[in-house]
From Swiss-Prot:
Keywords: Acetylation. This is BTB/POZ domain-containing protein KCTD2. The gene is Kctd2. It comes from the Eukaryota. PANTHER family: BTB_POZ DOMAIN-CONTAINING PROTEIN KCTD2 (PTHR14958:SF22), POTASSIUM CHANNEL TETRAMERISATION DOMAIN CONTAINING PROTEIN (PTHR14958). It comes from Mus musculus (Mouse). Residues 53-63 have a biased composition (Low complexity). SMART domains: BTB.
Length: 266
């Protein structure tokens, strides 16, 4: 089992946190986990650490010798325990966490405490997006966090794919801000009733459905009339040159064939 302990020691009025991360790896038959324990900002550096309770310690079952951990109780103010598997930490083979917790790279000469745990001085606030990306491969950044902070942590942990994603998001946000108010391109597509489902399902490249208008039909196929519709779709005007929309070549032919020459930019 791999444990990562956070103890915050706040210095100065501005609330700068010195975060001590301690990782201790124990070999066991069960897939190891990552445990995070933090101190509440109100705790001072002079206050001694509380004794570890039975619920905070990893236990060993008698049958298979597996070690188990349990979240800390709510009575222990400001302290929490987060567990994760070694498989998640090793998702990026060249990352810092994989080399430290999974490969036990001897080149990572990190300081250790009296228990042999590694000490890493980083801010745990931005560790959530890092861990979530290792879990499911998606970049999730809440409104309280900034992309620059996540980028800094991604570079520190040497997660190259995450670094690229964060840089792309920062670049998109900058482009959106520099372009001013968002403009939209509207397109009207004419289709028959039997083609409506296919047309909607083939929309791509950021096009969104806006409105469906029934216009009737003057065509007669045998004994059954085919109703006709106008489908209004739109998308943000991102890739443009002098107001002319540049459409990707891979857009479905059906989508282009049904487009009418009545698009306008608002």
């Amino acid at each position: 089992m791999a444990e990562l302990h956070w103890t915050r020691q706040w210095r100065g009025w501005e609330g700068v946190a010195a975060v001590r991360w301690a990782t201790a790896a124990a070999r066991a038959a069960d897939p190891p986990a990552l445990a995070l324990r933090g101190r509440h900002p109100a705790d001072t550096a002079a206050s001694p650490p509380p004794p570890r309770t039975a619920g905070a310690r990893a236990r060993t079952s008698g049958a298979d010798g597996r070690r188990r951990g349990r979240p800390l109780g709510p009575a222990q103010r400001g302290r929490y325990l987060l567990r994760d598997t070694r498989q998640t930490l090793g998702r990026e083979p060249k990352s810092f966490l994989c080399r430290l917790c999974c490969q036990e790279d001897p080149e990572l000469d990190s300081d250790k405490d009296e228990t042999g745990a590694y000490l890493i001085d980083r801010d745990p606030t931005y560790f959530g997006p890092i861990l979530n990306y290792l879990r499911h491969g998606k970049l999730i950044i809440t409104k309280e966090l900034g992309e620059e902070g996540v980028l800094e942590e991604a570079e520190f942990y040497n997660i190259a794919s995450l670094v690229r994603l964060v840089k792309e998001r920062i670049r998109d946000n900058e482009n959106r801000t520099s372009q001013g108010p968002v403009k939209h391109v509207y397109r009207v597509l004419q289709c028959q009733e039997e083609e409506l489902t296919q047309m909607v399902s083939t929309m791509s490249d950021g096009w969104k459905f806006e409105q469906l208008i029934s216009i009737g039909s003057s065509y007669n196929y045998g004994n059954q009339d085919q109703a006709e519709f106008l489908c209004v779709v739109s998308r943000e005007l991102n890739n443009s040159t002098n107001g002319i929309v540049i459409e990707p070549s891979e857009k479905p032919r059906f989508f282009r064939k049904r487009a009418l020459e009545c698009e306008r930019t608002v």
